[in-house]
């Protein structure tokens, strides 16, 4: 399953909406995705599954790329 992760690049800084970034990653569950990203210095704000029409919409975006970690 593909998940979209909203995050801040530096876990030590307070989250600011304008600096929120996102990435797409494959995983079995939200917990699996968080475990895969645990070694990164990210402040993870939100993880959501991307399926169906939402996935098709995201794939049409030129920024869509599934990250392998």
UniProtKB/Swiss-Prot annotation:
Self-association state and partner proteins as the record states: RNAP is composed of a core of 2 alpha, a beta and a beta' subunit. The core is associated with a delta subunit, and at least one of epsilon or omega. When a sigma factor is associated with the core the holoenzyme is formed, which can initiate transcription.
Recorded catalytic activity of this chain's protein: RNA(n) + a ribonucleoside 5'-triphosphate = RNA(n+1) + diphosphate
Keywords (A to Z) from UniProt: DNA-directed RNA polymerase, Nucleotidyltransferase, Transcription, Transferase
Name recorded for this polypeptide: DNA-directed RNA polymerase subunit epsilon
GO cellular component terms listed in the entry, alphabetical order: DNA-directed RNA polymerase complex
Family of this protein: Belongs to the RNA polymerase subunit epsilon family.
Superkingdom of the organism of origin: Bacteria
One Gene Ontology molecular-function label: DNA binding
Biological process per Gene Ontology, one example term: DNA-templated transcription
Job description of the protein: A non-essential component of RNA polymerase (RNAP).
Keyword Transcription attributed: yes
Gene this chain is encoded by: rpoY
EC number: 2.7.7.6
Transcription as UniProt keyword: yes
């Amino acid at each position: 399953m593909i998940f979209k992760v909203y995050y801040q690049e530096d876990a030590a800084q307070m989250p600011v909406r304008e600096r929120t970034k996102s990435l797409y990653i494959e995983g079995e569950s939200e917990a699996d995705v968080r475990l895969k990203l645990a070694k990164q210095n990210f402040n993870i704000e939100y993880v959501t599954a991307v399926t169906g029409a939402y996935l098709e919409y995201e794939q049409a975006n030129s920024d869509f790329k599934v990250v392998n970690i």
